[in-house]
Amino acid sequence: MKNILISLSGNCSTNQNLKNIEFTEIIGVDGGTKHLFDRSINPDVVLGDLDSIDTLLLERIKSMNINFVHYEVNKDKTDFELSLDSIEKPSEKNIFLIGGEEGEVDHLFSIFSLVTNFEYAENLTWFYQEKTILFRKN
């Protein structure tokens, strides 16, 4: 099964060695792209509405010719949900998340709502702080 890494905005304090996992696709979600660069990982695509990405990070993304998908701030889905939607045949992939820690409560509820109500929950792992949270369908 192919492995997908999604890096969310918000804090990211995981010490998981991501270099030990072979990812076929790496997605930076808005400001979560910084967590990838901090770990010397280059995303294949960055998507979001630019509400949590600073100018220097955006310039770095552009200078590296990384595919960038820009969304309007006013939209019906969160950037995280759009990143999940971008995955072709998600039920056939292992999806790993980093970031999304702490922050505003509504963001955490949104993450939990998405991963427990969609087909992504079949094979989703969230490296949350020092924990590994597995989401699997029964």
Name each model-derived stretch:
Residues 131, 136-138:
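Long, charged alpha-helical interface segments
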